[in-house]
From Swiss-Prot:
Tissue specificity statement from the Swiss-Prot or TrEMBL entry: Highly expressed in embryonic epithelial cells (EUE) in response to osmotic stress.
GO cellular component, one term: extracellular exosome
Family (UniProt): Belongs to the aldo/keto reductase family.
Pfam families in the record: Aldo_ket_red
Protein name (Swiss-Prot/TrEMBL): Aldo-keto reductase family 1 member B1
Enzyme class, UniProt record, top EC level: oxidoreductase
Gene encoding the protein: AKR1B1
InterPro entries listed in its UniProt record: AKR, Aldo/ket_reductase_CS, NADP_OxRdtase_dom, NADP_OxRdtase_dom_sf
Subcellular location: Cytoplasm
Length: 316
């Protein structure tokens, strides 16, 4: 198992990263420090997580202690939906760089294809509770992302939560300068994403799987929701390999040539989640896990279903 995947800009992206969505600011500094000590070299961030400053403190400390060099780290962040206007993209990226205390990002993603009205609110809502869209389009936003590469602020650019038609739109953009390096999507045994993954990989786009454990700490979880970590069928596969369910759920995307970014702020779990390079799921295990697909999404962005660029009305 290669520990890094080659991106279309020539960079090598660590196949396993630490996710920081929902990591409380008071805990994320310690989490990132532990992760780097344990061997993680890829940290997945975003402006909307409201903890990039604290992530940056941890990165700086580890650089200062010479535990790691900057060029060994792979730092990812994301452009939030309220910054899709061409004139706002660079400032949003600079804010992230300043919070993370870095000169450049290894990868910068458009977080969602849906542009929102600019302003202080991350989710600007109208009277009926729907998100207020911006009149931006994906291609203009992409052109502004390309400028960040030319200016040296980011090494690679990509997308997140884009369906295959939206990916195709970028690939067919007149005057396209840089292809998306990555599409980061939700992916786990209940949402296996075969068609979208096959499409992206056929175009030389690496896929990152987020919420590989089903995001059990999501604020909107309902008691009747299915639980990957408690699924007896997945527990059985884990027992067979003498591994935890989480380790199986992290290894599963890796064997599909996906990058995977499990989130934890618990030192023991951060270390446990990294111990996935010393075993292999059989092809039977892989087929079995793929068969559990039920097209169940943790992140459906339901406040945006009427947005013109809402990604999940399409089959893939």
């Amino acid at each position: 198992m290669a520990s890094r995947l080659l991106l279309n800009n020539g960079a090598k992206m660590p196949i396993l990263g630490l996710g920081t969505w929902k990591s409380p600011p008071g805990q994320v500094t310690e989490a990132v420090k532990v992760a780097i000590d344990v061997g993680y070299r890829h940290i997945d961030c975003a402006h909307v997580y409201q903890n990039e400053n604290e992530v940056g403190v941890a990165i700086q400390e580890k650089l200062r202690e010479q535990v790691v060099k900057r060029e060994e780290l792979f730092i990812v962040s994301k452009l939030w939906c309220t910054y899709h206007e061409k004139g706002l993209v660079k400032g949003a990226c600079q804010k992230t760089l300043s919070d993370l205390k870095l000169d450049y990002l290894d990868l910068y993603l458009i977080h969602w294809p849906t542009g929102f009205k600019p302003g202080k609110e991350f989710f600007p809502l109208d009277e009926s509770g729907n998100v207020v869209p911006s009149d931006t389009n994906i291609l203009d936003t992409w052109a502004a992302m390309e400028e960040l590469v030319d200016e040296g602020l980011v090494k690679a650019i990509g997308i997140s939560n884009f369906n295959h038609l939206q990916v195709e739109m970028i690939l067919n953009k007149p005057g396209l300068k840089y292809k998306p390096a990555v599409n980061q999507i939700e992916c786990h045994p209940y949402l296996t994403q075969e068609k979208l993954i096959q499409y992206c990989q056929s175009k030389g786009i690496v896929v990152t799987a987020y919420s590989p454990l089903g995001s059990p700490d999501r604020p909107w979880a309902k008691p009747e929701d299915p639980s990957l970590l408690e699924d007896p069928r997945i527990k059985a596969i884990a027992a067979k390999h003498n591994k935890t369910t989480a380790q199986v759920l992290i290894r599963f995307p890796m064997q599909r040539n996906l990058v995977v970014i499990p989130k934890s702020v618990t030192p023991e779990r951060i270390a446990e989640n990294f111990k996935v390079f010393d075993f292999e799921l059989s092809s039977q295990d892989m087929t079995t896990l793929l068969s559990y697909n039920r097209n169940w999404r943790v992140c459906a962005l339901l406040s945006c279903t009427s947005h013109k660029d809402y990604p999940f009305h399409e089959e893939f």
